[in-house]
Amino acid sequence: MLIRLDKYLADMQVGTRSEVKELIRKKRVTVNDNIVTNPESKINTDGDSVNVDGNAVGYHEYEYFMLNKPAGVVSATDDNTCTTVIDLIKTNNRKDLFPVGRLDKDTEGLLIITNDGAMAHDLLSPKKHVDKTYYAKVKGKISDMEVKQFANGLFVDEELTALPAILKVLSYNSDKDYSEIHVTIHEGKFHQVKRMFTAIGSEVLFLKRITFGALSLDESLKTGEYRALTKEEISILQRNQIKR
């Protein structure tokens, strides 16, 4: 793939576009051992060797991040009124990142940020039914009958009959009248988890996604924090990609 030298360096987080242009003009950048002073010079990402101050800068076409999304942030690339999940990725200069799917504004938890469109498309395909598990606090005491309703596939409303889902009750707080649960769904309809609990006469008080396919949220990530995925985690997503 051919790209401009300044974009190459900015994508690899050497600096901002203006910062890397200054590095290039100061003759601190070499391509195939030759000093290059034109930021617009084309670089072959598959074959050229790029160095800054003698240090090699390899190119990675795709980036993958795990974000522990906080409430109050929207799952979008751009928004004129709200902070977006992309705004939280502070250490990356790439302009082509996007969230894989979405979490509601008031929902927390695991969200994948990438620029790999093919992987995202496959992971979100209705044909793949990639599992997603949520931790939630819901109003009232969840009965065994309601657990079975989820397991059998729940009629939610005229627009949605949910596929069978796994509902596990963790605890019940009788003083405050709420249940802590894990629920695993195999699709991702609009407000699906909230609508499912509304359909059984309950209400979601707090919602956090903790798994996406076989990938689990890193418990060391505080709300609003993120990190790059490991090679093993990327492989996990790729296995989900070819699943079913």
Predicted regions and their residues:
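Basic, flexible Lys/Arg- and Gly-enriched helix-loop patches that mediate nucleic-acid binding at interfaces
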Residues: 2-244
